[in-house]
């Protein structure tokens, strides 16, 4: 997709880039992984020079997991997911394969950033700020199991009103074993 190409091109400035992505559209897959089916991964030509790329019949989370464990020779410093076509905010986050794959990276102990932009042909803000956001967010420490979730607005550059920073937590579980002893008597 155009978003993956633009993200890979920007990320190349900061190190080696490997792309492991589904072979087709996988919107609203959330954090789904494949358990009882065979998944194929195969090398593909990629339009950004120096980027190693693989496509997969699996989900975005499958791609992150397999990429970290089997394709990339050393554990990556970061996983970048996106650029998704459409915002991932509010309740949409729970359905997002873009955010889900970043959460999969966090569960594997790798810092991750999910990138999305408005569903329009206007990419002025993304194109102007993508490299800066990559640099700034990679320099800011993330706690274990946190990810950055970046949504670029679909407006012209002169209408941009500012940048809001947001972190999400992937605790790789559904609850925290922490109890209050009050009222247990």
Model-assigned labels for residue ranges:
Residues 78:
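Short, Asp-centered acidic motifs that coordinate Mg2+ and/or phosphate
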Residues 127-185:
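Electrostatically charged, flexible surface regions
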Residues 106-126:
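Glycine-rich phosphate/pyrophosphate-binding loops
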Residues 87-96:
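Glycine/threonine-rich flexible loop motifs
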Residues 101-105:
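Hydrophobic/aromatic ligand-binding patch that stacks against planar heteroaromatic rings
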Residues 20-22, 81-84, 115-116, 150-153:
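Short beta-strand segments
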Residues 1-6, 181-185:
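Short acidic, Gly/Ser-rich segments with clustered Asp/Glu that frequently serve as metal-coordination loops
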Residues 7-70, 74-75:
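A cross-family phosphate/adenosyl-ligand binding-site feature
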